Amino acid sequence: MDGAVMEGPLFLQSQRFGTKRWRKTWAVLYPASPHGVARLEFFDHKGSSSRGGRGGSRRLDCKMIRLAECVSVVPVTVESPPEPGAVAFRLDTAQRSHLLAADAVSSTAWVQTLCRTAFPKGGWALAQTENQPKFSALEMLENSLYSPTWEGSQFWVTSQKTEASERCGLQGSYILRVEAEKLTLLTLGAQSQILEPLLFWPYTLLRRYGRDKVMFSFEAGRRCPSGPGTFTFQTSQGNDIFQAVEAAIQQQKAQGKVGQAQDILRTDSHDGETEGKTVPPPVPQDPLGSPPALYAEPLDSLRIPPGPSQDSVYSDPLGSTPAGAGEGVHSKKPLYWDLYGHVQQQLLKTKLTDSKEDPIYDEPEGLAPAPPRGLYDLPQEPRDAWWCQARLKEEGYELPYNPATDDYAVPPPRSPKPAPAPKPQGLILPESGTTRGSGSKGFSSDTALYSQVQKSGTSGAWDCGLSKVGNDRAGVKSEGST
């Protein structure tokens, strides 16, 4: 059996059905050896670890903690300790966290012994005892301004699946450290057991944070290194993380107020020192002595550097040249400088001679008489459309243009349609029983006359005779006599 490094009573906190309670146990710490790994075992009472076989006492539910899986061992503060004067510390592994407690001296010894056994390369030393010699030649004092990067509480958490955690690639278990100015997420190195920072969130960039019985979550702002989003971590110490973060934020606010007050006091003292002093009047500077600065004036008010004056085209109207400006210096006259003078002289000559030709620019714009109206200046609406009586329009420009003949493709004129011959009328017989008198002067209106054409043998003329229809019919001249 391996020899124990340390053993003694320890209070172990267990949670069942939502209720937390402390249970007194007997803990035994074994180091790593050829016969076993470094571990921490718990028993019901003292002496149970020395018994073997079936006669030994029953172990607790938390049978053994392998120190190879230990992540951190840190002292913590609890609201309800198991007994007065007890100090608690937390042992975090890759699977869960264990909250232990003992009296003040034993708790410190347990923390240092566990750290030395679990982390042999950390250089942990036991607390000084009274038997150890005291070196008075060199005294070391702690710097109150020194703030190590690892200062704060560490909590074992498990990342939950959210949009932000998937974007950052968070999966599995991590260490969440609550520092003075930020939250830091740590992970174990691939080759070494050293904690390496993975992500951090400053308190000033956190939008909100909260806790639950089984988790702790916060919402990061868009200026955080991880980007915006909600991060949720599963842990049984959500309330402890929440209180630690709240205390760090309140402390940071207090430091900010103290800094602002110091700045105000410095400003007031500086104003009080300069209040009794007379400020000398500013010395006027010669604008011509020193060149102006590059950005002394805005862009729209920059002055043009002095240079030889040149008159541009249409720079000044006729007669507005200042007197004495060009005396003694023969300056080149601009182009079209006497155009307006010639135009005015022509207008005067035109008015005096009263010429019939319209000169150029004879009258100002807007005063010239209106030109005579053309043929199509006053369009008229078509009226009396009923007078056309649906007659065809004259064909003309609506016909297609023929480029070969350079003329419109006018169809040939149409010949007039022949008039139809009159249809012959049938013979109308008088009604039976009607008698006509011999003394009648003419024929009745309903009597049809038929001419009988006969050809004479001698003269070759046609003789027309009337056949007697009745007794009263008179003779009719032949068509040849007409």
Swiss-Prot record:
Keywords, alphabetical: Acetylation, Cytoplasm, Nucleus, Phosphoprotein
Tagged with keyword Nucleus: yes
Region annotation Disordered: where it falls in the sequence: 269-328, 353-373, 398-482
Modified residues (N-acetylmethionine): 1
Modification Phosphoserine occurs at: 48, 269, 290, 415
Tissue-specific expression: Expressed in lung, spleen, skeletal muscle and kidney.
Post-translational modification, as annotated: Constitutively tyrosine-phosphorylated. Phosphorylated by TEC. Phosphorylated on tyrosine residues by the insulin receptor kinase. Results in the negative regulation of the insulin signaling pathway. Phosphorylated by LYN. Phosphorylated on tyrosine residues by SRMS.
GO cellular component, one term: cytosol
UniProt-listed SUPFAM superfamilies: PH domain-like
Biased composition (Polar residues): 432-459
Entry annotated with the keyword Cell wall biogenesis/degradation: no
Domain PH: 4-119
Residues recorded as bearing Phosphotyrosine in the entry: 295, 336, 340, 361, 376, 397, 408, 450
Main location: cytoplasm
GO annotation terms (biological process): cell surface receptor protein tyrosine kinase signaling pathway; intracellular signal transduction; macrophage colony-stimulating factor signaling pathway; negative regulation of MAPK cascade; Ras protein signal transduction
Disruption phenotype: No visible phenotype. Mice appear healthy and are fertile.
Domain of life: Eukaryota
Ranges where the IRS-type PTB domain occurs: 151-259
Domain comment as written in the entry: PTB domain mediates receptor interaction.
Similarity annotation: Belongs to the DOK family. Type A subfamily.
Protein name: Docking protein 1
